[in-house]
Amino acid sequence: MVLCVQGLCPLLAVEQIGQRPLWAQSLELPQQVMQPLSAGAFLEEAVEESPAQPEREPKVVDPEEDLLCIAKTFSYLRESGWYWGSITASEARQHLQKMPEGTFLVRDSTHPSYLFTLSVKTTRGPTNVRIEYADSSFRLDSNCLSRPRILAFPDVVSLVQHYVASCAADTRSDSPDLATTPALPTPKEDAPGDPALPATAVHLKLVQPFVRRSSTRSLQHLCRLVINRLVVDVDCLPLPRRMADYLRQYPFQL
């Protein structure tokens, strides 16, 4: 006996109109057997397996602290006598061109991202190095490789005084090749020639500041410098309070 069964097309047609064929009616499977898993189940398992990484809290910047730090630096620089304000790189070059090596001054930077620039006479002529400000500290601008070794200071005068003392120690040392001051690049803003040329490294030597003629330092200030060079702590001196306060207003040797 031969059993005749309808082809696929009729079966498909029957399924399309909603009638189930006889061979399918005998297979009564529960509807929940083949339900797919949601993608969220896999994601939840993956999240549970991997430990959560602690988020780094962003460093809070105190605007008032920055303002006080910058104001204190400006106050120190005005007292120093070797802060030249808003002169240009060309004017600084003219002032330092005939000065001995190691003569320096501090001026306002022409770059909008920097506050100050250190102009110094080197063996290659007047050179300008920007002074960075970040996190209430100042440091000399440098390339990425030497930046981790560059020290930071609470004000510009402390920064300059440190490198002046380092150069003086190098001069007194028996090893002339010992270099305490780092090799720093010439900023693009003040580099001679094409500003697109890459900055080149130069070894700084800070010896003496170039004092402005218009800001002649008083005899009191010169005496204060001598006292600061000879005395570590002015509080130990038997001085009147007013005189001690005057010494604290500029606790530097330059």
Swiss-Prot record:
Residue ranges of domain SOCS box in the record: 205-253
Pathway(s) where this gene product acts: Protein modification; protein ubiquitination
Gene Ontology CC annotation, any one: plasma membrane
Region of interest (Disordered), ranges: 171-195
GO terms of biological process kind: cytokine-mediated signaling pathway; intracellular signal transduction; negative regulation of cytokine-mediated signaling pathway; negative regulation of receptor signaling pathway via JAK-STAT; protein ubiquitination
Keyword presence, Lipid biosynthesis: no
Keywords attached to this entry: Growth regulation, SH2 domain, Signal transduction inhibitor, Ubl conjugation pathway
A GO term for molecular function: cytokine receptor binding
InterPro entries, A to Z: CIS_SH2, SH2, SH2_dom_sf, SOCS_box, SOCS_box-like_dom_sf
Residue span, SH2 domain: 82-188
Ranges in coiled-coil conformation: none
Keyword Signal: no
Pfam families the record matches: SH2 (PF00017), SOCS_box (PF07525)
Record text about domains: The SOCS box domain mediates the interaction with the Elongin BC complex, an adapter module in different E3 ubiquitin ligase complexes.
Assembly description: Stably associated with the tyrosine-phosphorylated IL3 receptor beta chain and tyrosine-phosphorylated EPO receptor (EPOR).
Purpose: SOCS family proteins form part of a classical negative feedback system that regulates cytokine signal transduction. CIS is involved in the negative regulation of cytokines that signal through the JAK-STAT5 pathway such as erythropoietin, prolactin and interleukin 3 (IL3) receptor. Inhibits STAT5 trans-activation by suppressing its tyrosine phosphorylation. May be a substrate recognition component of a SCF-like ECS (Elongin BC-CUL2/5-SOCS-box protein) E3 ubiquitin-protein ligase complex which mediates the ubiquitination and subsequent proteasomal degradation of target proteins.
Name of this chain's protein: Cytokine-inducible SH2-containing protein
Protein source organism: Bos taurus
Organism ancestry: Eukaryota, Metazoa, Chordata, Craniata, Vertebrata
Gene this chain is encoded by: CISH
